[in-house]
């Protein structure tokens, strides 16, 4: 078992608290009931959440559930980061969320990274350069001798017991183009900062799950494949959780989510229906 009982309970407590918080926030929001067309159209919403066609055709109970599900899904991404941190602490020396690297590098390095990202942005080819190829370009540039201070943040930082480092940007498995470019820029900056480190450094775009299936080959989202080094810089589902813990971590974590979901289902249903 890769997730020990103590960590398992920590995760369950955290997820229970997360759902309680979501329910508390939702309970403070009033879903406008549809009684008749005239009264609904006469209503004013400061939040801009009036949906006359939806409210006309969809039962109010379903609308409430849908609204809660969207709210829950928005916040669910943060639970992946915290669960990864807690699990990583059982398997590695250090695990920190929102990890900041304060650094000073030559102006030319920062500018070259931005240029590489700009080239990816304008990419009309199927394959962008690999992370390794881009780092080789950075190492060959002429320096200005003028240093610039920057802070680069990683969603999750892990230091293994051998001193090697892992940096993760944990994002949606269906990002837009801008999000892909932002992650690639951050990964390149991390590698540039760590280029003289004597210990191995790896930086990844991490996806907590694969919407298309269990294996990597099933992932077909074209934007990620076009605007990231998908082969070398992206880890998905099982790959990510195995780096955090062990090969069984992904399925064990899903089982914990399922246990919490089942235990909270009656409470959620009671409050929403």
UniProtKB/Swiss-Prot annotation:
Record lineage: Bacteria, Bacillati, Chloroflexota, Chloroflexia, Herpetosiphonales
Pfam families: RE_TdeIII (PF09520)
UniProt keyword annotation of Nuclease present: yes
Disulfide bonds: none
Catalytic activity: Endonucleolytic cleavage of DNA to give specific double-stranded fragments with terminal 5'-phosphates
Family membership: Belongs to the TdeIII type II restriction endonuclease family.
Name of the featured protein: Type II restriction enzyme HgiCII
EC number: 3.1.21.4
Any one GO MF annotation of this record: type II site-specific deoxyribonuclease activity
Keywords assigned by UniProt, alphabetized: Endonuclease, Hydrolase, Nuclease, Restriction system
EC class name: hydrolase
GO terms under biological process: DNA restriction-modification system
């Amino acid at each position: 078992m890769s997730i020990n009982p103590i960590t398992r309970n920590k995760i369950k407590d955290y997820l229970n608290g997360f759902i309680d918080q979501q329910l508390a926030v939702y309970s403070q929001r009033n879903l406008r009931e549809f009684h008749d067309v005239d009264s609904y159209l006469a209503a004013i919403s400061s939040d801009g959440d009036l949906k006359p066609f939806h409210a006309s055709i969809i039962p109010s109970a379903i609308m409430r559930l849908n609204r809660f599900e969207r709210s829950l899904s928005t916040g669910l991404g943060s639970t992946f980061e915290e669960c990864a941190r807690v699990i990583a602490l059982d398997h590695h020396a250090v695990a920190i969320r929102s990890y900041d690297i304060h650094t000073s590098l030559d102006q030319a390095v920062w500018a070259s990274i931005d240029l590489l990202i700009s080239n990816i942005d304008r990419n009309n080819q199927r394959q962008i350069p690999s992370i390794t190829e881009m780092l080789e370009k950075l190492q060959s540039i002429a320096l200005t001798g003028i240093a610039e201070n920057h802070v680069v943040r990683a969603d999750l930082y892990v230091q293994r017991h051998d001193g090697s480092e892992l940096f993760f940007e944990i994002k949606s498995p269906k990002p837009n183009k801008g999000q892909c470019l932002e992650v690639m820029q951050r990964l390149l900056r991390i590698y540039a900062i760590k280029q003289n480190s004597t210990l191995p450094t790896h930086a990844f775009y991490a996806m907590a799950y694969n919407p298309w299936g269990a294996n990597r080959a099933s992932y077909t989202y074209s934007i990620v494949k076009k605007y990231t080094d998908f082969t070398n810089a992206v880890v998905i589902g099982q790959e990510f959780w195995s780096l955090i813990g062990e090969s069984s971590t992904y399925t064990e974590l899903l089982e914990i989510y399922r246990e919490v979901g089942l235990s909270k289902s009656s409470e959620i249903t009671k409050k929403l229906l």
